[in-house]
Amino acid sequence: TPVGFIGLGNMGNPMAKADRIITMLPSSMNSIEVYSGANGILKEVEKMGAVFMDAPVSGGVGAARICNNMLLAISMIGTAEAMNLGIRDLGLAQDSATSTKTPILLGSVAHQIYRDFSSVFQYLREEETF
């Protein structure tokens, strides 16, 4: 196996046979323990002629959370806009069908479900302010 990751459980044994080991640990204390703790890997890999390379991961948990929330918000804006366009088009289609006496079998049901959901959402929003 050319590359291994420091891990637990079933993955640990195959990783011990890897040519390269990658660690991605949450803190400096964890890294120190993994490399030079009581059962650290540093002594064994040094005997094999291993070298250490550092490539720290930028950012932190807080920054990653903010980035993920921002990406989610951006995608939700697109979803909300698509819903607004869809309900407008559904209303136009329903009006056209009514004026030409052409039934849209599930169109009116979809429109009614949207109206029902909108009123429930409005009610919950008003309750939230109190």
UniProtKB/Swiss-Prot annotation:
Pathway: Amino-acid degradation; L-valine degradation. Homodimer. The modification N6-acetyllysine is found at residues 43, 47. One of its GO terms (molecular function) is 3-hydroxyisobutyrate dehydrogenase activity. The modification N6-succinyllysine is found at residues 47, 101. One of its GO terms (cellular component) is mitochondrion. Belongs to the HIBADH-related family. 3-hydroxyisobutyrate dehydrogenase subfamily. The gene is HIBADH. GO terms for biological process: valine catabolic process. It catalyses: 3-hydroxy-2-methylpropanoate + NAD(+) = 2-methyl-3-oxopropanoate + NADH + H(+). This is 3-hydroxyisobutyrate dehydrogenase, mitochondrial. It is found in: Mitochondrion. Its EC number is 1.1.1.31. InterPro entries: 6-PGluconate_DH-like_C_sf (IPR008927), 6PGD_dom2 (IPR013328), NAD(P)-bd_dom_sf (IPR036291).
